[in-house]
């Protein structure tokens, strides 16, 4: 049978399917659907999904309906004393009246964590989220806060659930998308624009499960300096206290703010927002706002399925999956182009390479179908400009002190190890070698549980020389240098500086090999010492300015940080 005859037969079968759907002429239209259930039948563009937008302006990612609702079975549910229709396509509805449920604190420190955090807040699987959100306004805002300004984003919410629902596992594609699909050829490459137009109209996914209600969302963008000398438990407690204070204030209450909350607010850009109900009533108190949520609920979270799974024609389903794959790759190109532009304006190393990458991205923007070579090129660009999760999440910079004699000289402990993730300072080490003559043995290390081959050649370098007495740390004016590759401690440096033995000049450097990716070549190493108020950051492969370790008659607080910009 010729290809043309096959096409004619497929169109006839498709028309028969359309006519046989339960939403055909004669099906009962739902006059009054349970509030909020309409969101379950609409498509979602996963690249633009912004379920909890930080700002009111912009595209939230919801698209046209992918399924039709009918009410032939006459199912109903009572919401706030009023009866509403439950569509036949909805498998189950639970009307709830839960009290306030407060989420845990979500902390986003790196660009690689944004999609994961947004997926958790929306109740979406992390696997699905790997390709999602990058074209949304909230993603762009967080990306800029983290990569351009070096801030940490924290989120917390109070949730008031009024309804949860599941769509039928036998859901059928709606009449409008089915008719649009019928006009497309079976081969994606024969009409790529037609498939992309379908995606622009109906999206890439739909929610097969959903939770509706009201929410108060708190978001903070906090300067890195705030986190110095605070552990994770202290930070989380302060974020929770700030959240509670702002929620109380926003709902007409009052709150006595602690000094910790005041300090956090002074170091942060904070936004807060109500979703669902008559939000203008929130200022009059929760008792005014909460009763309005049930009939004006917000779609808060859910579980996604692909629209392609609703396509019965296996050939067209495969073509739609290919179209979605390429559509997601186009979104990835746009995201990397935006990130590369940020890098050009914030990195000090590799501008020529970044311009070359930008030119390659401009070429990729013209693609409608991506080859395997294009995908490999995209991955190589991402490897250069995006800080990977293995570094931001599973790498630490560590310092350890060991007392030779009295622990009083060495932070009050015989052995003391202080570690910090990238973009965090270690807690302060209190240098008190003036209290004795035995001193403290000091070492440093970069640790990671996962890395690429070139990272094994990244080194911590430390050098020192005495200023007037060879007893302090060796011959006067002669620098001593020690270094250690990743996952190894440096050799011991014996710190015996005091008025009796003398003073020493100290310097540090993070050494990154030429084979490293661009993000690594733009690492910074920072020191923050209380004595002399010495605080500075230097690029990789550069020594910090000499620090004069006097250790005379006061303790000196010392902190170190590895910064991925």
UniProtKB/Swiss-Prot annotation:
Residues 27-340 form the MACPF domain. One of its GO terms (cellular component) is other organism cell membrane. Pfam families: MACPF. PV2 is a very high density lipoprotein (VHDL). It contains 3.75% of lipids. The major lipid classes are free sterols and phospholipids and also have significant quantities of energy-providing triacylglycerides and free fatty acids. GO terms for molecular function: nutrient reservoir activity; toxin activity; wide pore channel activity. Produced by albumen secretory cells. Found in developing eggs. One of its GO terms (biological process) is defense response to virus. It comes from the Eukaryota. Keywords: Disulfide bond, Enterotoxin, Hemagglutinin, Lipoprotein, Membrane, Neurotoxin, Secreted, Signal, Storage protein, Target cell membrane, Target membrane, Toxin. Residues 1-26 form the signal peptide. Coiled coil: none annotated. Residues 387-565 are annotated as: Invertebrate MACPF Accessory Domain (IMAD). The egg defensive protein perivitellin-2 is a pore-forming two-subunit glycoprotein that affects both the nervous and digestive systems of mammals. In addition, it is a source of both structural and energetic molecules during embryonic development. The tachylectin subunit (31 kDa) binds target membranes while the MACPF subunit (67 kDa) disrupts lipid bilayers forming large pores (inner diameter of about 5.6 nm) altering the plasma membrance conductance. Perivitellin-2 is a dimer of heterodimers held together head-to-tail by non-covalent forces. The heterodimer is composed of the tachylectin subunit (31 kDa) and the MACPF subunit (67 kDa) that are disulfide-linked. This is Perivitellin-2 67 kDa subunit.
